[in-house]
Amino acid sequence: MLPVILNPLRLKTGLVGQGAALARRATLLAEAGIEVRLLSPDVSDELLTPLQLLFVAGLGEGEARHLAARARSFGVLVNVEDTLPLCDFHVPAIVRQGDLLLTASTGGAAPGLARALREHLAESFGPEWRGRVDELAAERARYRSQGLPPAEVSQKVRAMVVEKGWL
């Protein structure tokens, strides 16, 4: 596995599914700022072709397998919720506090552990981290505007975290 943070503004993303699984996935994508095209399970090739990512949730395995194969034939990366063999990528357990994004993944091997780790991270990095990230970003921008080299900027930001006792 290779963890990657994707810019949702650069992706054409589709979502196909039904029921509670579809609703959960739609919420997850909305929280990530992804503008998603909600498609029916019998989506046309014309609508699949421009996509780069396709999320499938709440469909039977046979239907999901067929849809995933069709999407892949157009170069679309596919995630079928809870069906590892049909996934080109996985979505980790997520804790989001403003711009701070923490994730935990077991590559699908132990979802319960990933969930427990997410809960632990959420307790350890609460809403106060939103302001902390903003504060650090402002200081970093100030240091960079002064023309400091990247290594020195990193050192100063790290020193600020230590000085404030955040970690």
Protein language model features and the residues they cover:
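Short basic, glycine-rich beta-strand/loop surfaces that mediate nucleic-acid
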Residues: 52-59, 88-108
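Short amphipathic alpha-helix with an adjacent loop that forms part of the alpha/beta core around
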Residues: 43-50
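An accessory alpha-helical subdomain
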Residues: 108-167
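ADP-ribose/adenylate-binding Rossmann-like module
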Residues: 53-54, 64-91
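Hydrophobic, well-ordered beta-alpha structural blocks that scaffold small-molecule cofactor pockets
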Residues: 1-42
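Short, ordered loop/turn segments at secondary-structure junctions
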Residues: 41-43, 82-86, 107-108
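Residue-level detector of alpha-helix initiation sites
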Residues: 20-21, 61-62, 108
